[in-house]
């Protein structure tokens, strides 16, 4: 079975030994949790899905403040915090089970640049407007919903980093109204493939103006009545 280090080397990803040690501990914790928090039962699958998929499309150093919405098992936010030490990361999730897992992992990995908040994204974004340089999400919602619940917390000039699958083109078309309303524009799409055969895309959107105060709408509404 390949080690974390060997898998990252296969993709030409750069790392330092302390980072590998932390990822090893994280994967160990991840594989030990119940099925309803992660579907990965082996190291190879867990590293590809939770580490390689996150790092592979990133071409620049990330620094500043980053909010990870719907963090779940800590991806992408926790991985970005490990590999980009100049980031100050907030992991946001409304589920008690996820929050407890994340707090435990942060303590075991001795990560000083990460904190966890238990709250709905709609409430958090309204309370912490224009605070973050980056907002990330993966497997949380369709793009039009993400744009509404994430953008208000982003600084003007900041970037949304959304990890998507091959259906992102359809989601982009669907999200045009939300992007216009929330004042963000598509900066670039980085398509990439894993050696497992899976195709992925990192969508990078830039906020060019402050979002209207009426967004995000109250809890649940962006999901039930998305901007179309």
UniProtKB/Swiss-Prot annotation:
For molecular function, the Gene Ontology terms on record are:
rRNA (guanine-N7-)-methyltransferase activity
Q: Where's it found, cell-wise?
A: Cytoplasm
Which Pfam family is one of this chain's hits?
GidB
GO annotation, cellular component aspect: cytosol
InterPro entries (alphabetical) = rRNA_ssu_MeTfrase_G (IPR003682), SAM-dependent_MTases_sf (IPR029063)
Identify which top EC class this enzyme belongs to: transferase
Q: Entry's CDD domains?
A: AdoMet_MTases (cd02440)
Range of residues in the leader sequence: none
Q: Which family does it belong to?
A: Belongs to the methyltransferase superfamily. RNA methyltransferase RsmG family.
Function, as annotated, reads: Specifically methylates the N7 position of a guanine in 16S rRNA.
Please report the name of this protein according to its UniProt entry. Ribosomal RNA small subunit methyltransferase G
Q: Which organism is it from?
A: Thermotoga petrophila (strain ATCC BAA-488 / DSM 13995 / JCM 10881 / RKU-1)
């Amino acid at each position: 079975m390949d080690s974390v280090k060997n898998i990252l080397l296969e993709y030409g990803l750069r790392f330092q030994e302390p980072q590998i040690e932390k990822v090893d501990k994280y994967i160990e914790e991840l594989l030990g949790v119940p099925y309803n928090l992660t579907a990965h039962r082996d190291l190879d699958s867990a590293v590809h899905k939770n580490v390689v998929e996150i790092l592979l499309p990133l071409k620049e150093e990330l620094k500043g403040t980053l909010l990870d919405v719907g963090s779940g098992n800590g991806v992408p936010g926790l991985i970005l915090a490990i590999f980009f030490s100049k980031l100050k990361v907030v992991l946001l999730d409304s589920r008690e089970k996820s929050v407890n897992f994340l707090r435990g992992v942060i303590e075991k990995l001795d990560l000083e640049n990460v904190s966890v908040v238990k709250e709905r994204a709609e409430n958090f974004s309204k309370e912490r407007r224009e605070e973050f340089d980056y907002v990330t999400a993966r497997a949380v919602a369709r793009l039009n919903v993400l744009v509404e619940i994430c953008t208000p917390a982003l600084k003007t000039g900041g970037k949304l980093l959304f990890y998507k699958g091959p259906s992102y083109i359809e989601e982009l078309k669907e999200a045009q109204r939300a992007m216009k309303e929330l004042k963000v524009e598509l900066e670039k799409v980085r398509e990439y493939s894993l050696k497992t055969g899976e195709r992925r895309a990192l969508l990078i959107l830039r906020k060019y103006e402050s979002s209207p105060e009426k967004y995000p709408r109250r809890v649940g509404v962006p999901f039930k009545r998305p901007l179309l």
